[in-house]
Amino acid sequence: MRIEKRQVEGQPLTVIVEYPEWNNSVQSLIGKIEKMDLSFVGRSEDRSVSIGISDIYYIENVERKLFLYTKDEVFRLDGTMPDIESRIFDTGLVRISRTCIMNTDKLREIKQIRNSHLEAVLDNDEKLIVSRKYLPEIKKVFRKEGV
């Protein structure tokens, strides 16, 4: 595989994938590239903002309301956890508890804190509780990424 990188000012990010034959690896690569463009619309007071996957730290369900957390802002989301889960497949966002979805790209470390719980520490020093029930999903993401 050959990778070429080139900065072109004033142009949107463009990715061209050239391949000798269509196969699962090519399909997976294109799927991941397309997922990078996925975004959610979050509301904060009187404004609505489009938030890309790469800006999301975690999504939390609090008293039947969804909140999306970025590095330093919180937005209200419409929908339900199952709605969100159906959109985030293969993006690095994974369910870590009944009420929380975390972006594994923002994960700094996981450590055990109690018998059945783990603590995820994110790049912004936010700490989230990880249920052991969801640990296999997190491990699966790390295996895919070669971590």
Regions picked out by a protein language model, each given a short descriptive name:
Residues 25-123, 127, 147:
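Conserved binding/recognition cores within well-folded domains
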Residues 1-27:
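N-terminal regulatory/sensing modules of transcriptional regulators
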Residues 140-147:
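Short, charged, intrinsically disordered terminal tails
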Residues 2-10, 121-130:
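Amphipathic, soluble alpha/beta structural segments
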Residues 129-132, 136-137:
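C-terminal structural segments of small proteins and small subunits
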Residues 26-29, 132, 141:
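Short, charged, solvent-exposed linker or helix-capping segments at domain edges/interfaces
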Residues 19-20, 71, 98, 132:
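Conserved residues at beta->alpha junctions
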